[in-house]
Amino acid sequence: MKDVMLSTRAKAAVRLALDEDLADVADARKSKWCDATSEALVDPEAIATGEIYAKGAGCVVAGATVAKAVMKTVDPKIKVTILKPDGSVVKPQEPILVFRGKARSILAAERTALNFMQRMCATATLAKKFVDATKPYGTLILDTRKTTPGLRVFEKYAVTCGGGTNHRMGMYDRVLMKDNHRRLWKGGDPDELDQAVVAARKKFPKLAVEVEVESLRECASALKAKPEWIMLDNMSVADMKKCVRMCKGISKTEASGGITLDRAKEVAACGVTAISLGCLTHSAGSVDLSLEWRAV
């Protein structure tokens, strides 16, 4: 699991989030960061030790390195120790990370650090539930592009912290022909999907090609060109099983379309290679995290 903070996009997003909280909205570039409350009430030389922990059970840690980066961006002298690395499952009130430094700096970074972590932990925790539910079948749990604008790198990283697997990062790293593409290809003829695969490979020979299908007929058409993946969209269990048999030895299969945790095991039992889930990044919610002082 590669540290998300190695990404230049992640570093830029952390800076933007801090600007949002600490810089004058009129001109963030020229504005000095300011936490007015702390500057008014807290001794500038006061040193404090604090910790972040989850209040509920079963939280999967994600974003500990992000919280550390937030703290260090505000004040490089803050000492941060990660006690529970990303991917760990923690008990209620079990410290995830501990930090020591100027109290003003910690207070300035607090909310931004928690905002990142509480959402990332929620995504990781939900991903783990799906991974655990489908574990007997070895089914991959994939995310989607249904992410918060500007925060995709964090949300997709959080999925991996919960044991999930990243689907394509964007529209540039895989050809994925969905329903709206199909309608624009050869007048939407379901028997011409193989030719769409051929055209995609000709244009982007190094990229994997995936075709979304909604029927056995469309699946059979696409399979003639042997795409790397077939996405089975909103299919019944019976049709999914048939498509899996058709695709065996030719293409990997991905089940998609509003699959809930209650249905995940049944879908996995169909033999699909993977299940993709928009809910991991658009509906996971947030985990209740708290930052508390250990010593002031």
Regions found by a protein language model. Name each.
Residues S236-M240:
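Nucleotide-binding motor/catalytic cores of P-loop/tubulin-like NTPases across gene-expression machines
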Residues N234, G257, C279-L280:
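Short secondary-structure boundary segments
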Residues C279-V296:
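Short, charged, intrinsically disordered terminal tails
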